[in-house]
From Swiss-Prot:
It is found in: Secreted, Extracellular space, Extracellular matrix, Basement membrane. It comes from Mus musculus (Mouse). Residues 147-230, 416-447 are annotated as: Disordered. This is SPARC-related modular calcium-binding protein 2. The gene is Smoc2. It holds the Pfam family Kazal_2. Residues 34-86 form the Kazal-like domain. Residues 206-216 have a biased composition (Polar residues).
Amino acid sequence: MLPPQLCWLPLLAALLPPVPAQKFSALTFLRVDQDKDRDCSLDCPSSPQKPLCASDGRTFLSRCEFQRAKCKDPQLEIAHRGNCKDVSRCVAERKYTQEQARKEFQQVFIPECNDDGTYSQVQCHSYTGYCWCVTPNGRPISGTAVAHKTPRCPGSINEKVPQREGAGKADDAAAPALETQPQGDEEDIASRYPTLWTEQVKSRQNKTNKNSASSCDQEHQSALEEAKQPKNDNVVIPECAHGGLYKPVQCHPSTGYCWCVLVDTGRPIPGTSTRYEQPKCDNTARAHPAKARDLYKNRPLQGCPGAKKHEFLTSVLDALSTDMVHAVSDPSSSSGRLSEPDPSHTLEERVVHWYFKLLDKNSSGDIGKKEIKPFKRFLRKKSKPKKCVKKFVEYCDMNNDKSITVQELMGCLGVTREEGKANTRKRHTPRGNAESSSSNRQPRKQG
């Protein structure tokens, strides 16, 4: 976790131009990973209380706490024993980042300090041309970032920031959006700032025809074109999944930073950035969850077009419904245990949730490679036409991450909702199911 004095780094790491790959060789990552295994999990409460002042101006209560922080920032060093001077915070960060600029990040942000050691009210990043207002302890103030000009800073941190001239125009999409006094642990502040890629995506999407759906593939191509232009070395090129979605984890290879994004828009999720390791991301996080119902509508299932796909989905839901009814009716069946059903769910929705819980042995929220095997056997045994079985699991895996979520399973089986009602139609009643007489449905015809 980055020290609080360096709360600019995640924002500015993405503003930096890519540096040669050899800066972060396999040996570098290996060394950092080994350090993490050894130091990052240290339990420090029982360590002797001997304060240390670090090179970034931060005071650590023990050597153990310092080592735990150093595993996240290998360049961190001990400046001297004892507490750091409060007024030297900005000065220490300035000295520290200047050293970083010489060693590793040539375009790292270097703060400006007042004579008393506090942060200057206006801070600028010379390479990108952006300036913004900060509080006396260096935190950015929301809505103050401007390009190639001096921002109008509020008289106090509680004063409402005046909106800058031209706000709301198209060129605002390129300005970094900074947090207003983030709450919580100061050490977590570093992970809350959007990356330059946020603004690149926003800017490119604004240029996309409003009548056409933007996709990661389009953004990827646009970024490649931008990267070819002069002085565009800082362009971040997104990684794409199947179907025009973004991969849930995006990284800036030259700096080692990674963060989670919304898979449908590519927007970074605040509080998720990490360095030298991949964050744990939600593979289904979306800005517009309601649109997920349309993802499978025109998605082709190889070897199973049109009416055949509809017949196949109906046979799968019929078989699953029958299995659930039999399992619930059999007192000796452990698979028949159902949690309290949602009264708004239709039979098909209950069936999918029941079967998903049955497959998700480790309760991880997705069905992995090993957990999916019973589903494949079920499809081969109880569904028809058989030609539709071969590629069905891949068809369900919308983001191509080798696992299936309950939303993906519902979507690929055609069990979706529209305007608060399940988008299903009347179908065959499973034997032995009294409840289904009032809930007989058929999946939406796809393809």
